[in-house]
Amino acid sequence: MTLRMLFAFALLAAAPAQAQQTEPQPAEEGGLSGTVSDDSEWQDLGIAIPAFATNADVPTPTSAGSTSALGQALAQVISANLRNNGLFKPVGPESLPRPGFEQVQAPDFAVWSARSAEMLVQGYVRANGDGQLTVGCYLYDVALKQQLEKAGWTVAPADWRRAAHKCADMIYARLSGESPFFDSRVAYIAESGPKDRRMKRLAIMDSDGANHRYLTSGQATALTPRFSPDYKSILYLSYLNGRPRIYVYDLAANTQRLVTETPGPTFAPRWSPDGKWILYSMATAGNTDIYKVPASGGASQRLTDTPGIDVGGSFSPDGSRIVFESDRSGSQQIYVMNADGSDHRRISFFGGRAATPEWSPRGDQIAFTHIVGNLRIAVVSPGGGDLRYLTDSWQDEAPTWSPNGRIIQFFRTEKGSGKASVWQVDLTGRNERRLSTPGDASDPAWGPLLP
């Protein structure tokens, strides 16, 4: 939902199978470790990622093809994951020699040292007799001639990309000292059709933009999705039956239920970090306020009661505070309050308007849309200081954080055409890229790491 749509609406109303871990087990801690504090510290770290080996090249029921082709595809996904996060510049798998199956755990370090590789990622893929796939992943320090990490997973053929994401997560966590984020999913709104008759469907995809799946038919407009903390459901706004209300979509059962019966239109839903509460805004008698209701059902509690429009809400990671937007001062601005609705405090005093705030999983920053002519993605501390812009386009809005709080996804609307697409940017603001989607896309919502 665009900012204009959200506030206009309020004014008018006054809106999977798990991967099983298998051998090899992770190695003991040792070798390279550290914490990324500066982008340049790791930017030139040479990570070689050749195609994964296989014990036998046999057909698989995957989109990649045989186990040999799948080994190439696994390395490509891992390399792309690490390249696109802004910390590393991996090389391969193209132009690199593929190791033999027997070399995966006994690399020729001299070969890789001659290629100026500092780190080496090798692995294998094996087709099992039960139809499953086993993927092994190994991280080596070339100079030390030492294995740093190893892990393996047994996955269904349809989930082969999850094994690649998990391998990238293992590498990222070891080399950066930070929590990983690749093995996660994004809920978003898939858009199609002309501007005056736009179809908006609830959809999900992998964090890198692969494996798209539509969840709703598009007969009713869907907006502002949010994954539950346990990944079992998605909270979203729908115009099902012609009235804007909040629903929970059950991903296993492919069913949806109404969150609560209310006298006025409801919109801008959000989960609490523990999944026990749902925040929402409701417009009644010319006023819009924020409420919370037990996720299991029950009576709603009103959290704001001021003249004007109070919209949205994002919990701090510990669930003790809520950041939200309000026009009580005359324009959209960002406020923070306690989770019980007490102690409201404005934190945006930097000119223009501020909207769609989202608390970082780390708790140290709040991402939001800053509106001064154009719409830009920015971050600020919970106290309102340290303002930084991450994008500089015509209309960027609705930021959502990666599980580790290092990457932000948002959607960008093209001037003139009105076409929307999902983009991501790291906290330096220098590593920006568009995610590929089958059609137009908006309202991204990044979920936590998959279990």
From Swiss-Prot:
Compositionally biased region (Low complexity): 18-29
Subcellular location: Periplasm
Region (Disordered): 18-37, 431-451
Role according to the record: Part of the Tol-Pal system, which plays a role in outer membrane invagination during cell division and is important for maintaining outer membrane integrity.
Signal peptide: 1-19
Subunit composition and interactions: The Tol-Pal system is composed of five core proteins: the inner membrane proteins TolA, TolQ and TolR, the periplasmic protein TolB and the outer membrane protein Pal. They form a network linking the inner and outer membranes and the peptidoglycan layer.
NCBIfam families: propeller_TolB
Primary localisation category: periplasm
UniProt-listed PANTHER family: PROTEIN TOLB (PTHR36842:SF1), PROTEIN TOLB HOMOLOG (PTHR36842)
Keyword entries, A-Z: Cell cycle, Cell division, Periplasm, Signal
HAMAP family, alphabetized: TolB
Family that this chain belongs to: Belongs to the TolB family.
Any single biological process term in GO: cell division
Protein name (Swiss-Prot/TrEMBL): Tol-Pal system protein TolB 1
Pfam families assigned to the protein according to its UniProt record, in alphabetical order: PD40, TolB_N
InterPro entries recorded: 6-blade_b-propeller_TolB-like, PD40, Tol-Pal_TolB, TolB_N
Cellular component, GO annotation: periplasmic space
Family matches, as SUPFAM superfamilies: TolB, N-terminal domain, Tricorn protease N-terminal domain
